[in-house]
Regions:
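Conserved acetyl-CoA-binding loop-helix of GNAT-fold acetyltransferases
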Residues: 79-92, 113, 209-222, 241
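Conserved GNAT acetyl-CoA-binding A-motif
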Residues: 93-105, 224-234, 254
Length: 280
């Protein structure tokens, strides 16, 4: 890494620097995702002498068991060791946790060089959905109340393999829509829709089975003035089919990697849509 760059932990006051870096990289999304990252985790920046960011690493630790990592470097500062320094800094902060991250094809070789291995993939869809939500027999939807938080956190921990309380407690109050799927008189899934810049992000969607996930997806995606965006694990065939059937455009695929190729914990088959690929 060049000598005119220093690493430091960023705070909420650095949000304009983060947004400028995102614009430079051409990332979708906006301030809400960055605020969510600040609330639920930590952001480390590579700051240049002129005060701008040459890069940043977003680390979301979950009880020391799992951590999500995302790294971005300004195009003007690529191939100078900044990404490697940010990854090393973030991994040191993550300790012994299982660390996961997403990478597009262009970044895959770098991620493998710093010790990550592919364990899956995620597909991004976006657009204005059409059609109505499916209504599987025996399932219903209802709004979420304050008394539901404990149940949502428990469902989510089973699926993700670690408690994401800080993330969900920051996300749920700011969401455009939150719903529970019920079956047999009990909750069997939940989902969230939240505005992020010029789109409504659909996710997370966590459900015990695909039928409940599809019911949630149709409900969460309907009736927004903005286009929707959803990140779907590549092996969730019913959710992929729903996105295509709703007329959403496939924007691309990112590899899901873990440090050392370690299997990620939890009942991951219950995660049908991510918060976003860059967060968790």
């Amino acid at each position: 890494m060049t000598g005119d760059v220093r690493l430091r932990r960023l705070g909420q006051a650095d949000l304009p620097l983060c947004l400028a870096l995102a614009r430079e990289r051409g990332f979708s999304g906006g301030a809400p995702a960055w605020r969510l990252a600040f609330a639920a985790g930590e952001i480390h920046g590579a700051e240049t002498a002129d005060g701008s960011l040459a890069g940043a690493a977003v680390l979301l630790p979950f009880a020391g068991r799992v951590a999500s990592l995302a790294v971005a470097v300004a195009p003007r500062r690529e191939r100078r060791g900044i990404a490697r320094a940010l990854v090393a800094h973030a991994l040191a902060a993550a300790g012994t946790a299982d660390v996961q991250m997403h990478a597009p094809g262009a970044a895959l070789a770098f991620c493998e060089r710093v010790g990550f291995q592919v364990v899956g993939a995620t597909v991004r869809f976006a657009g204005a959905p059409r059609g109505s939500a499916p209504s599987p027999r025996g399932l219903a939807l209802r709004p979420v109340g304050g008394a539901d938080l404990a149940g949502i956190l428990a469902q989510d921990e089973i699926a993700f393999g670690a408690p994401r309380r800080t993330l969900l407690e920051a996300l749920l109050p700011a969401s455009a829509r939150v719903a529970l799927a019920t079956g047999g008189g009990r909750p069997v899934g939940y989902g969230v829709a939240w505005e992020d810049g010029d789109a409504v992000a659909i996710g997370p969607i966590v459900a015990e089975d695909p039928a409940a996930a599809l019911l949630l997806a149709g409900h969460l995606a309907a009736g927004h003035a903005l286009p929707v965006r959803v990140d779907v694990p590549a092996d969730r065939a019913p959710m992929l089919a729903w996105a295509r059937g709703a007329g959403l455009s496939r924007l691309g695929t990112a590899a899901l990697l873990s440090r050392g190729g370690r299997p990620l914990p939890g009942r991951r088959e219950r995660i049908h849509a991510l918060v976003t690929a860059s967060l968790a």
